[in-house]
Amino acid sequence: METEIPVNEKETSFRRRVYTTIETLIDIENTDQLQEHLPHLHCLGWDEVVEERYVNKQCGFPSCQKAPPKITRNQMFEIDRKEGKIFEFRKQRAKFCSEMCYQKSSFVRKQLDEHPLWITGLTEARTQKVYEVPDESFVSPIAEKSEPVDSQFKKEPSIWLVTDSIIAKVQDMKLSEEAEEPKSLDPEDQDIEPFKLTDDDKDFIKSIKEFRNSNFGPPSTSKLLKTAPKPVLSAKDRKKEDEVLAKLRAKYGNKNALQKKPPILIEAQEIHSKLKTMEKAKEAWLVDLIKSWFTPETRKLVREGARPTGGAAEQILMDFLSGKKVDAEKLVNLPNLDKYNVKEKRLNIFLHSIRNHWMDLEARLHLTPTRRDILSRVASTFQLDSENITGWTKREINSIVIALFIVICLVDVELGDDYFKKDNASPELTAISNELCGLDSFQITGLHAAIKSQC
C-alpha cells in the first residue's frame, strides 16, 4: 500500500511550487515557458508576478524585455483615514510598457483559477486546461488611445471648408439706421474713435431692408391690447341692477352667508394589536438571543473598545497588578476528552453560518475587511451552545447580522459615529436593513438602545 502524504506537507509543497513559478516568470524569455507554468498560478499569483517584474524595472507581462515608461506622478502616496495608514499610489497600467502588454496580461489573468494551488490541488480541470498565451499578433479588444486633436493640427495643416448656413431668419433681424454710441467708455478706450457708418454701410443696410420687404412684407407693428374701461352706470341703471340682485337673493337665498358646518373629524384607527405584538416579538427574540451570547468579557470589550492586546503575557501582568488570584488547577493543560476544542468548534460553526450574509452587508455598506476581524474577536467572547449557533432562516440571519453590526458599532466608536449619530440609525443603514430583514428606522434605533443597555 502506498503511504499517504500528510495534508500539511502537501500544502507546503504546493506553496513552494507556486513561489518557484513566480520566481521563474520574473526572468522568462519566451511564451512557451509561460504556458507550461500557468496551471500552477492563480489570479493573485499572477498579480505577484506583475508586481515583482515591475519592482525589477521590467514590463509586467512575462516574456517582454522592455521596461515600463517613467511616469511623473503628481500624487505619490494615498492616505486611508479609517485605517490610519499611508500607501504608495500606484496604477496597474503603469506597470506595463504599453497598452498591448496590459491587455495581454488581462487576457491571461481571466483564464486562471481564482483559488490557489494549495487549496484545489492538481485537479484534472486545472492540468488538462489549454491556456491561450497571446503572441505579437494579439489584437487588443480596446482600441489604443488616439492622439489629441491639437497634435493632429500641428502635424498636418489642412484647409477646412465650412458650408453656408442661415444663422437667423431675415424677418427676425433688427437693423438700425445708425449705430448708437456707447454711453460710457473705459479710461483705457477713451483714445479709440467711436465707429461711424459710412455711405457704403448705409447702402448695404438699405438693400437688406428692401429685400426683406419685397419677400416677406413690411415688419408687423406691435399692437398693444388695450383693455376697455368699465362702463359707468347711471343712478337709474344702478337701481335696476340692485333690484334684480335683491330678487335673485330672495328666490335662491344667499348660500355664502349661511354658516358652514364644521368638518367631520374621523379619528385614526389604532394599529391592530396583533400587528403590534408581532413587531414586538420580532425584536424580543433578537434581544433575547443577544442576551444569551453576552458574557462579562463581551461587556468589557464593548466598554474598552477594540484596542490591540499584548497576548497572554500582558494578561498575566494585568492579573498580577490587579491582585487577581490564579487557580493553580486551571494552569494545567489537560487533553480534551473528545480530541477537539468544543468552544472553538462552536465558534467556527457560528461564523460559518453568518459568513455570506455578513459579506453581503459589508459590500452594501462599503466596509473594509478589518471589520470582519472585530466580528471574530467579539464572537470569541460569546457564550455559545448547541441551540444558539445555527438553525435560522435567511431572513432571521439577516436580522442577526444587523444586530451584530450594532454590537461592532458599540465596540468601534468611529464606525458608530458614522451609522448611529446621536443614537439614531443612519438612512443608509435603515434602507439596507429594511430591504434585507424588514426592520425600519424605529426598530433599529430600539434594538440599538436595547443592546446598549446590556453593556
From Swiss-Prot:
EC top class named in words: hydrolase
Residues binding Zn(2+): 59, 64, 97, 101
MF annotations from Gene Ontology: RNA polymerase core enzyme binding; RNA polymerase II CTD heptapeptide repeat phosphatase activity; zinc ion binding
Keywords from the named record: Hydrolase, Metal-binding, Nucleus, Protein phosphatase, Zinc, Zinc-finger
Superkingdom of the organism of origin: Eukaryota
A Pfam family this chain is assigned to: RPAP2_Rtr1
Enzyme Commission number(s): 3.1.3.16
ZnF bounds (RTR1-type): 36-121
Family stated for the protein in its record: Belongs to the RPAP2 family.
Role summary: Putative RNA polymerase II subunit B1 C-terminal domain (CTD) phosphatase involved in RNA polymerase II transcription regulation.
Protein known as: Putative RNA polymerase II subunit B1 CTD phosphatase rpap-2
Source organism of this protein record: Caenorhabditis elegans
